[in-house]
Amino acid sequence: MGKTMWARAVFLCFSVGTLLWQEVLTRRIPVDTGQCGLPKSQEDLNSFLWTVRRHPPAYLFGTIHVPYTRVWDFIPQNSKKAFHDSNSVYFELDLTDPYTISALANCQMLPQGENLQDVLPRDLYRRLKRHLEYVKHMMPHWMTPDQRGKGLYADYLFNAIAGNWERKRPVWVMLMVNSLTEADIRSRGVPVLDLYLAQEADRMKKKTGAVERVEEQCHPLNRLNLSQVLFALNQTLLQHESLRAGSFQAPYTTEDLIKHYNCGDLNAVIFSHDSSQLPNFINVTLPPHEQVTAQEIDIYFRQELIYKRNERMARRVIALLKENKDKSFFFAFGAGHFLGNNTVIDVLRQNGYEVEHTPAGQTFTAAKPKTNPTSDDSMATDSPAMKYFDHVPATASYFGESDEEMLPPHLLLPDSISQLEEFGKQNSWHRKHYRNQRPRQFNDLWVRLDDSTTTLPSNTRNTNGEQSAESLVWLPEQDHHNYLDVKLSHSQSNSSPKCLSASPAFLYTLVTLCLITTMRTRS
């Protein structure tokens, strides 16, 4: 009788383990996303709006590169009014210009006749190829029913993001890998905040422009030496392999960024991470020689992608303000450019401009556009400040810079602006678009690093190690909305719970404890 009971107990333990494992494979376990509720009053909202005191006024607005529906309801009404009442709206890049697309595509490519396999070490190339095969296999499972309902197809989406990857420079492949996460794929379907503002400005017939060029943004990345690029690509692959294996969780996630933007502290660290779009590779677990490489990359990125970029953007803002004294402006840049040290605001103040933070709930009277900006010939389009924005290479005389100064520019690195192709100005995608292989669009070229991380687990440091990655880490799923139906005055923001798959080790431990208890009972 005792043996029979013991056998039944053993069978029960294994049955429990099997059922738990099946639950993990077939169902997602909800985890609190930690998102905050919408405040009851405007005064309680975070404000990323600054006012440049002039007549008419100019505004600086800090954005983040996430789907706009996740943050729009948390943006104060006075920020939206400033956008609505401004004559001109300027961004970091012209998000809807075909020239941007072709220039970025050319910048990312290796020299003619070279392939990635010729540049990368064999082991690193093999790991990269295997990871991309894994992503391609998983993409149909990552996509949401809502995305499929809008006509997005996994094969098309993968090729749109990773197409021709073997011809790209290694540093751009690294950024591409960071954009091929489940969280990023599931966020496709709604334009990011920057792109939404650009589309709204276009719909409202406002004058739009940019303060940066693609050529400027590409050069800093392409000037990294090969050893630095290989180090960065290896670190990136290691962290994604660890995420696949369930042994690692990124400290900076899209959800963290959204929470800080909507209701958290104005933490310059996390917003700088979003604005530079590159991880900090410094890690205390690295050996000394790799620490040196990581520090060199960190210093280079910080100088080129944040400080120099802030300086250049501010000088071009100043040029626009001087050349168009009777026009009101709304400058929408990444929030990280306005927070911390050596910011765009600091440069403006150093040049005599009075810039004040505009709290949520503060009322002001903005100057409304006098005429239709698109037909207003009084805009100084032939001025030195405006010549820069023409589709021709800028010369030194445009901004009083030498050719040498024009070369080391600043970078709006890939982010979730990478949405124009799927969502652009069309209602939906159809399979025929993939079959016809139409020209690639802006979002194919921009990638995002929202879920990248600045640290690496010590047990995965081996640069030539082969990783086993069978268990998945489920990341947030977005409940998307058709942005064409959402007007400037209102949006909806829903997200389903963040989910994590249970670790196999945890399940086996549970079964083992059950067996031990059973054996003790038998004895």
UniProtKB/Swiss-Prot annotation:
Cofactor list: Mn(2+); Co(2+)
Compartmental location: Cell membrane
EC number: 3.4.-.-
Bilayer topology annotation: Single-pass type I membrane protein
Entry keyword set: Cell membrane, Glycoprotein, Hydrolase, Membrane, Metal-binding, Metalloprotease, Protease, Signal, Transmembrane, Transmembrane helix, Wnt signaling pathway
Function recorded in the entry: Metalloprotease that acts as a negative regulator of the Wnt signaling pathway by mediating the cleavage of the N-terminal residues of a subset of Wnt proteins. Following cleavage, Wnt proteins become oxidized and form large disulfide-bond oligomers, leading to their inactivation. Able to cleave wnt8. Required for head formation.
Protein's name according to its UniProt entry: Metalloprotease TIKI2
Organism: Xenopus tropicalis (Western clawed frog)
Biological classification of the source: Eukaryota, Metazoa, Chordata, Craniata, Vertebrata
Gene, per the UniProt record: trabd2b
